């Protein structure tokens, strides 16, 4: 199994980007993406891709990590803390507070080189990836900023994670018949 992290800036990235010059937008995104990426990599994560203001990352591939869920959870919380520390720098560019949503899920994902014989990406696919993305988006409904699946909570706790997890609800997500916790 792998841990998948999906993060996204919130509070109107489109609106923020419309109000910035190309140079300011580049400075803002590079500052944010660099800081978050450094944390993910320090916790043994693999950056899958950047999609605009979003970061997709995973743990437990290409090398095995017996504590991958713990690493992912701790990286997510450190990213939130770092974003708070960076607020004054970011507000100087955006003129508004910047927040992010993070979704974490542990599950089976297919990881490898996907594409054509002319171009391919080392990436991951599968239900675990989709659920992490859905959890990231569901934060908006609950007024939260970091959400993980029950499977991630269990695996992180088993690996010695000392954080407090709060059960919010059984959630029905797009593409699944059964609710997730």
Regions found by a protein language model. Give the residues of each.
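Catalytic core regions of nucleotide second-messenger enzymes
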Residues: 43-44, 48-51, 82-103, 142, ...
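Membrane-proximal helical linkers
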Residues: 1-2
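Cytosolic regulatory/linker segments at or just downstream of nucleotide-handling modules
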Residues: 109, 138-181
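A short glycine-enriched loop-to-beta-strand structural element that forms part of the catalytic core
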Residues: 58, 96-112
């Amino acid at each position: 199994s792998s841990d998948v992290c999906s993060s996204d800036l919130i509070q109107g990235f489109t609106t923020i980007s419309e109000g910035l010059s190309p140079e300011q937008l580049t400075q803002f995104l590079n500052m944010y993406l660099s800081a978050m990426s450094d944390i993910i990599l320090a916790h043994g994560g693999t950056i899958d891709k950047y999609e605009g203001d979003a970061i997709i990352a995973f743990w437990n591939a290409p090398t095995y990590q017996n504590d991958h869920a713990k690493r992912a959870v701790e990286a997510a919380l450190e990213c939130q803390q770092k974003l708070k520390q960076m607020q004054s720098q970011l507000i100087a560019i955006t003129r508004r507070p910047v927040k992010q949503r993070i979704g974490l899920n542990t599950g089976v994902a297919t990881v490898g080189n996907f594409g054509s014989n002319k171009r391919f990406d080392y990436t991951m696919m599968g239900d675990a990836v989709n659920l992490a993305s859905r959890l990231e988006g569901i934060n908006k409904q609950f007024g939260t900023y970091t959400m993980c699946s029950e499977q991630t909570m269990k695996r992180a706790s088993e690996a010695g994670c000392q954080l407090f997890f709060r059960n919010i609800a059984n959630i029905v997500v797009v593409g699944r018949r059964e609710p997730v916790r």
